[in-house]
């Protein structure tokens, strides 16, 4: 099969890296050849695949060596569970410089050093954050990734972030080949969560590709720095990640999204009871004023 490159975005703390690594482990278990490129200065995109605290990053090693050209591919690329290739781009010290530059530097280095080998089926870019800013848009801006998946939940801020990411991707979709493949709902057990995310997906013209239920086995596996696929392959949660993997393999619904306006998003949240129906008569009034 032709190489498929996928960027995974989502609100900070939504479980994006955990979801990505469990998805990748399921793909590897099914015989797919996969590489993960962590695009986050926290460098936590590969720890469950490698059973490590944090993989050494391209930017750290480049700083130690003098410059990125002084590195070899084997310095930055490690092999983890199921033969998954793992790389962390890293970034500068907090408060110094643009972390997005680390993503650009790392991807260019990997290309030049032949990391994107012919036997690869998938590359997943696990990308920082709530917004598609310049540096972190690198995987989609430069047409590296053709597919975007957004991890979200039924919480209001996760939905705002998902809509903003869809909005940020539209520009690059029109100028290149990147398309939105769907929303992955990583459940927080909010009311009517699956219905809400399906409604949000429909609103922006995509699909909820899978609903991942909440299960404590994920945390039990993480404590051991393992994916659920490896830690407890017979768990129901492992089957959920396998189902997500199959759906992504088979996915043909790749779209240019039509992001919701703030008013449309708030109407959706009010419809599902996430946000109270706005009463203009009380706007700006303190509690003591009623």
From Swiss-Prot:
Oligomeric form and interacting partners: Homodimer.
Binding annotation for ATP: 10-17
Assigned EC number: 1.18.6.1
Alphabetical list of NCBIfam families matching this protein: nifH
Cofactor section: [4Fe-4S] cluster
GO molecular function, one term: nitrogenase activity
Protein name: Nitrogenase iron protein 2
Function per UniProt: The key enzymatic reactions in nitrogen fixation are catalyzed by the nitrogenase complex, which has 2 components: the iron protein (component 2) and a component 1 which is either a molybdenum-iron protein, a vanadium-iron, or an iron-iron protein.
Binding residues for [4Fe-4S] cluster: 98, 133
InterPro entries with a match to the protein in the record: NifH/chlL_CS, NifH/frxC, Nitrogenase_Fe_NifH, P-loop_NTPase
Post-translational modification ADP-ribosylarginine, affected residues: 101
Family listed: Belongs to the NifH/BchL/ChlL family.
CDD domains (UniProt xref): NifH
Superkingdom of source: Bacteria
PTM entry text: The reversible ADP-ribosylation of Arg-101 inactivates the nitrogenase reductase and regulates nitrogenase activity.
Entries under Pfam families matching the protein: Fer4_NifH (PF00142)
Catalytic activity: N2 + 8 reduced [2Fe-2S]-[ferredoxin] + 16 ATP + 16 H2O = H2 + 8 oxidized [2Fe-2S]-[ferredoxin] + 2 NH4(+) + 16 ADP + 16 phosphate + 6 H(+)
Keywords on record: 4Fe-4S, ADP-ribosylation, ATP-binding, Iron, Iron-sulfur, Metal-binding, Nitrogen fixation, Nucleotide-binding, Oxidoreductase
Cofactor note: Binds 1 [4Fe-4S] cluster per dimer.
A biological-process GO annotation: nitrogen fixation
Miscellaneous information on this protein: This subunit is associated with the vanadium-iron nitrogenase component 2.
S-S bonds: none
């Amino acid at each position: 099969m032709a190489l498929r490159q996928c960027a995974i975005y989502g609100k900070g703390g939504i479980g994006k890296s955990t979801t990505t690594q469990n998805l990748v482990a399921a793909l590897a278990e099914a015989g797919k050849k996969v590489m993960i490129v962590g695009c986050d200065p926290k460098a936590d995109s590969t720890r469950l695949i490698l059973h490590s605290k944090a993989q050494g990053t391209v930017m750290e090693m480049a700083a130690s060596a003098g410059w990125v050209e002084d590195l070899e591919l084997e310095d930055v690329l490690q092999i983890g569970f199921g033969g998954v290739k793992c790389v962390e781009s890293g970034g500068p010290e907090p408060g110094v410089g643009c972390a997005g530059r680390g993503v650009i530097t790392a991807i260019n280095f990997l290309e030049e050093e032949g990391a994107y080998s012919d036997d690869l089926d998938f590359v997943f870019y696990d990308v920082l954050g709530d917004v598609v800013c310049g540096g972190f848009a690198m995987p989609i801006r430069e047409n590296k990734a053709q597919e975007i998946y957004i991890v979200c939940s039924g919480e209001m801020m996760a939905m705002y972030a998902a809509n903003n990411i869809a909005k940020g991707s539209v520009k690059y979709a029109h100028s290149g080949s990147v398309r939105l493949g769907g929303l992955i709902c990583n459940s927080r057990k909010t009311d009517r969560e699956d219905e809400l995310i399906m409604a949000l997906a429909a609103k922006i013209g995509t699909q909820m590709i899978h609903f991942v239920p909440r299960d404590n086995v994920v945390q039990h596996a993480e404590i051991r720095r393992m994916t659920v696929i490896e830690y407890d392959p017979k768990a129901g949660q492992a089957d959920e990640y396998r189902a997500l993997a199959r759906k992504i393999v088979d996915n043909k619904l790749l779209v240019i999204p039509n992001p919701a306006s703030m008013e449309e998003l708030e109407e959706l949240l009010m419809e599902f009871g996430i946000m109270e129906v706005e009463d203009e008569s009380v706007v700006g009034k303190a509690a003591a004023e009623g």
